[in-house]
Amino acid sequence: AELLQTVNNPEITLYGVGSVEEEVGLRGAQTSAEHIKPDVVIVLDTAVAGDVPGIDNIKYPLKLSNGPGLMLFDKRYFPNQKLVAALKNCAVHNDLPLQFCTMKTGATDGGRYNVMGGGRPVVALCLPTRYLHANSGMISKADYDALLTLIKDFLTTLTAEKVNAFSQFRQVD
């Protein structure tokens, strides 16, 4: 809600979706994908922080207070590389920390948007979270603030031309 209230960009129509049943088939993402038919999708999610004892920090490289994570792939999703580059540039431009992660055994809602209606440009950003899927988790306020700033700046500067460019690919003969 905070993000939706702060982005004022007449060039885009912004939808905020809170989805359900990600863990059992991305069902909420399926419903919103079919109803909204978005041009570009930015999934905001959480991911395991591997900076606590007992967690494999190779498998889970994200650390609290090192910035949000950009998911490079999961078992159902592969991000649009132009969106990845645009978000990396936005982070650099705003001097914001950004980590990178992958997930071989889980999935974000991005996987559903990858395949709906011929596929949509999608990218997933995650807040590193300790004790994910427990009765309480822990995030860093600095990571939250960096994520909010990154997305706000990205959406505020988004144009129809940029949105169209995310879907344009050069055909190789």
Where are these regions (language model features)?
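Short coil/turn connectors at secondary-structure junctions
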Residues: 9-14, 37-39, 94, 119-122
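Short, mixed-charge aromatic SLiMs
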Residues: 21-28, 173
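Active-site-adjacent substrate-binding region
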Residues: 65-148, 154-173
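A generic local structural motif
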Residues: 4, 27-30, 111
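Acidic, glycine-rich active-site loops and adjacent beta-strand->loop/helix elements
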Residues: 17-24, 46-48, 129-131
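Alpha-helix C-terminal capping segments
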Residues: 2-8, 34-36, 114-119
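Metal-dependent peptidase/peptidase-like ectodomains
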Residues: 27-97
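Alpha-helical metal-binding/catalytic segments enriched in His/Glu/Asp
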Residues: 1-23, 147-154
